[in-house]
Amino acid sequence: MAIYNKLLLIFTFFFLYSCSSSYEKLNNANFSPPDSFSKHLFDMYKEKANFEAEKMHDWNSAKLYSEKALEAAKGVKIQPENINYWKIPNEHQTQIKLAYDNLMSIYEPALIHDPYNLANAISSLDCWSEQQEENWQTWDINNCKDSFL
C-alpha cells in the first residue's frame, strides 16, 4: 500500500507539472508572433489560458490554451480543435459542429482578409466547445458562444 501511495503521489506531481509547464513558459517569456493573425491568436489564447489557470483553476484547459498560444507565437496557423476532441453533450453537438464547419469553410480567405475576426472565431469556438463540454457554467458557455457569433 505504501508503494501505491508513493506512485500515486509521483504520478500526481508529474501530471500537475506537465499541465503547468506550458502555462509558465507562456507567462515567463516575451514573444513576438510573426504576423497579425498569429499575434491576435497569441493574445486571445493567452487571455483564455490566464483565465482558466487563475480564475477557474482548470489546468487542463489552461494547458491547451497555453500550447495553442505558444504555437501561434511561432507563426503556426492554428485551427480550432476538431469537434471530436471534445466530449460535448449530444444536444449541443449539432450546433457546434455546424459552427466548426462554417468556420473551416472561410478559414483560408479570412487568413488574408480578416485575420482578427478569424482569430477571434477560432479561439471563441475552442472556448465554447470547452465550456460546453463542462456543461455547467452557463454564463461562460454563453460568453464564448456570443464571442464566436
Regions from the language model: what does each represent?
Residues 3-10:
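Sec-dependent signal peptide recognition
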Residues 19-149:
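Long, charged/polar, soluble alpha-helical segments
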